[in-house]
Amino acid sequence: MSHLFSKACQYFPGGVNSPVRACRAVNITPPIVARASKEVFVDSLDKTFIDFCGSWGSLIHGHSHPKICAAIRQGLERGSSYGLTSEQEILFAEEIFSYLGLETNYKIRFMSTGSEATMTAVRLARGITGRPIIIKFLGCYHGHADTFLQEKPFSHTSLETLDLAHPLTLSLPFNDFPLFQTVMNSLGHKVAGVIFEPVCANMGVILPVPGFIEGVIQTCQQTGSFSIMDEVVTGFRVAQGGAAALYHVKPDILVFGKILGGGLPASAVVTPKDIMDHLAPEGKIFQAGTLSGNPLAMIAGKVSVNLCREQGFYTQLATIEQNFLSPIEHMIRTTGIPVTLVRYGSLFSFFFNPNRPNNLADAQLSDIEAFQKFYQSAFSKGVYLSPSPFEASFLSAAHSMESLDYAQTALIESLEQVFSLV
């Protein structure tokens, strides 16, 4: 254990300020970051890592992008926080509306974290419908509000574990539309909203089966429940209009975060006006935040989104993904090792199971011990994947061919080592 991590453990629970950073799922001592640039970070022991976590998907342009850094420095001279509406918020809202192609009947509310945004989405759904129940899907992560932490391992101190006659949250298997439809036929009149990730990223990368997302949204329309699409991970990453554009759907409520802030804390809820105007001060549903719409986060976010709009940006990401992951897929296929590499855009996950998972139960069939050995080998070679078998890893536009070639070789060698192919 490093001296700095020992010191961190004196001050922070587990030495971290967010649990997965402790790297216990992969059984390593977590690195303490000293600095970062482009696709790499350097730890306190002066070891360089190629970063495929990227602040959990926030850094699609890599660390310390010069345009984002310059904008933040310039903005800082005008103030770091106002507690008032600023020009930066308005300019950023205009940028987002233009980027997403939103109609004029939409509105946005800025916040600081994804958890705040999903919590606000649920408050809107319950407040407008007057209904108590929220439906989510097993393995999908929507932040640490009690409403979302019904199942293990998160439920230990959740409100939902209390002995309530009627649970306020129902968790159903992802991709099981017949079961979802059965539940909605029975309880739809009590369901305020259904929240879902269009592409799961917190049980590894799991894709929706054809028709699942469309069916969920259509069923919500039929029952008067709100469809809440959590695009904290997929928004601004998988396409210009996010997953909603790729699947050609219009959920009632959209939630964004991560890339939205350009590396600083920012999130947003986007809805049609007739929904958003129920929020205070226009309506009676309360939501507030001291740092909501922080001017520096708005500045960084505007530059981040503007960079995503550059000609060929998503084509470049797709090329990076193809060149990096296809040879690894080929190695897995030709050797017959029991591993499945799932990728979607610039997200990817290794499941140590020969079968592609469709839900949390499938994902949990992964050989965790084998994943840990694979992870530890890659880590020792200076390749930093997201440190859990149930988290997505991420590519960025900053990943150079040199770094990708090195990491590709390191990952293939690590797979060979785990399965004694060398």
Curated annotation (Swiss-Prot):
Its main location: cytoplasm. GO terms for cellular component: cytoplasm. This is Glutamate-1-semialdehyde 2,1-aminomutase. Homodimer. It catalyses: (S)-4-amino-5-oxopentanoate = 5-aminolevulinate. One of its GO terms (molecular function) is transaminase activity. Its EC number is 5.4.3.8. It comes from Chlamydia trachomatis serovar A (strain ATCC VR-571B / DSM 19440 / HAR-13). GO terms for biological process: protoporphyrinogen IX biosynthetic process. The lineage of its organism: Bacteria, Pseudomonadati, Chlamydiota, Chlamydiia, Chlamydiales. Pathway: Porphyrin-containing compound metabolism; protoporphyrin-IX biosynthesis; 5-aminolevulinate from L-glutamyl-tRNA(Glu): step 2/2. Keywords: Cytoplasm, Isomerase, Porphyrin biosynthesis, Pyridoxal phosphate. It is found in: Cytoplasm. It comes from the Bacteria. The keyword Cytoplasm applies. It is an enzyme of class 5 (isomerase). The keyword Isomerase applies. Belongs to the class-III pyridoxal-phosphate-dependent aminotransferase family. HemL subfamily. It holds the Pfam family Aminotran_3. PANTHER family: GLUTAMATE-1-SEMIALDEHYDE 2,1-AMINOMUTASE (PTHR43713), GLUTAMATE-1-SEMIALDEHYDE 2,1-AMINOMUTASE 1, CHLOROPLASTIC-RELATED (PTHR43713:SF3). Its cofactor is pyridoxal 5'-phosphate.
